[in-house]
């Protein structure tokens, strides 16, 4: 249900974002609800980035385009907190809070694919 972004083997990421792909539909939990509940716990999240074909500039010029891959990715992505001095305890708090809100368990990693590749 929850997995990190897959990394390309021929590049090194900048790690400026920590994006999880979450199957909100399969879990029956709307992304906006997850964002709001995390915010109440002091955990800020965002959605990066709106697909180009859904941006007003491109819609106005090219009309509505159907790009199912981009739309599917966008519907599942959630950027989690990430900062240089983030401690293991902070990571645990974020992941345990996310798991609880999603109705999953994090302790055994059964529902979380924690491998980037």
Where are these regions (language model features)?
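PLP-dependent aminotransferase class I/II
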Residues: 1-117
